[in-house]
Amino acid sequence: MQNGSNAQKIHETLEKKGKEMTFHTFLIKYGEIGIKGKNRYLFEDALVNQIKFALKDVDGEFDVYKTQGRIYVDCSEFYDYEEAVESLQRVFGIVGICPVVRLKDQGFDQLKADVVAYMDEMYEDKKKTFKVEARRSRKNYPKNSMEINCDLGEVILDAFPEIRVDVHHPDILLNVEIREDIYLYSQIIPGPGGMPIGTNGKAMLLLSGGIDSPVAGYMVSRRGVGLEATYFHAPPYTSERAKQKVVDLAKLVSKYAGPIKLHIVNFTDIQLYIYDKCPHDELTIIMRRYMMKIAEHFAKEDECLGMITGESIGQVASQTMQSLLVTNEVCTLPVYRPLIGMDKSDIVKISEKIDTYETSILPFEDCCTIFVAKHPVTRPNLKRIIKSEENLEEKIDELYAEAIHTVETIVVS
C-alpha cells in the first residue's frame, strides 16, 4: 500500500507532468550486431554513423552515441518526432526503436511517482495486463532488479485498481533501466533489421525502371551491402522521363541504402547493332550479356564484390534457368539474385512497403522492353549464342568502349 508521502509525491508528479508526455531520447535496439564478438564495435560504430546520416535532414538536433552496450539518440527540445521515427525505421541494423523517458535519479520514492505518471499518461485504457522488467547496470543501486520489479509493480497496482499483472504475456512490458540515469520505456517500434550499410562490402545493382530491381537492391543492402547501380538508357527510343524515373527509384532505394553512385550508360548503338547482326529470337539474351559485361566493368573499377539483379526464375524469357546460365557466363564476379525464388506478388508487396511500386509502374519504357523479340528463345544454347556473337566482332569492341567512355555518373541520395 502507498504511504502518505508516496501518495503525495505521485499526486505532485502527475500535476507537474500533466498530459503532455514528450520523448527526448530513443534507445536503439539491434539484433545480430550483438553476437559479433571482438568485431562488435565496428558494427556499432557503423550503425551510429548510419543513424546520424538518417537524421541529418530531420527538423531538430540529435546526439547519437553508444555507451555500455547501448546506442542512444538524444533529441533537442523541439524536433519532429514522426519524421525522426520514420527515418530511424529505414536504418538497417535497427530492430527496435524505443521512445524513452530519461530521469535523473532522485531516490526510489520519486521513481515510483514517475512510473505511475508514465503509466497514467501512456495508457488511457487501464484495463490491461502489465509486467515490470528492471535492469540494473549500476550495481551500487540500493535495490536489486527483483526488488525493483516488485516495488514498482505494487505501486502501479495501488494507483490503478483495474490493471492486472501477467508475467508471461503482458499487454504492457514496462522496462526500467537503472544506469547513471534511469530510463523508462514500454514501446518498441519495429526497425528494418539487417546489418548496417557498408559492413559487408559493396555490390553493383543492374537498375531498370521496373518493379524487381529496386527490391533486389533493397534486399541485398539490408544485409549491410553498399550499392552502386548501372542503368541502360536508349535515346531516342527511351525518353528523358524514363531516365528520370530510374533516378527517382535510386533515390527511393537510397533512403535505406545510403547514397548510390548511378552509372547511366547510353546503350542505343549497341542495341541497334545487335538487332542488325544477330538472330531476333536471341536478341534479349545477347543484349543482356552485354549489359552484364558493361556493369561488371564499372563494378570492378569501383571495387564492388558482386553484381545484383532482380531476376526471378521463369518470370520472363531471359530468366529461365538456361538463360541465367548463359547470362552468368560473361561475368567473373558473383551475381546475387535475391528474388530468385519469389513470386511476383511477393515482390510487389515489398516494393509497396519501400515506396518504389508507384514509381516503378509509371508508363515509361526502358531499353529492355523497346527491343524485345516477339518470340525470344527460352532455352538458349551457350555455344550457339557465342557463335551468334561472332557476327558482332567487326564493331562491337568499339561500341563497347564508347559506351564506357560516354557514361554519365551521378550520386543520388
What is each model feature region?
Residues 205, 229-231, 264, 309, ...:
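Structural beta-sheet core signal
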Residues 358, 362-413:
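The feature marks non-catalytic terminal segments
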Residues 154-156, 193-200, 271-272, 276-354, ...:
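Active-site adenylate/phosphate-handling loop in enzymes that bind or generate adenylated species
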Residues 69, 265-270, 312, 365-373:
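A glycine-rich phosphate-binding loop feature that marks nucleotide/adenosyl-phosphate handling sites
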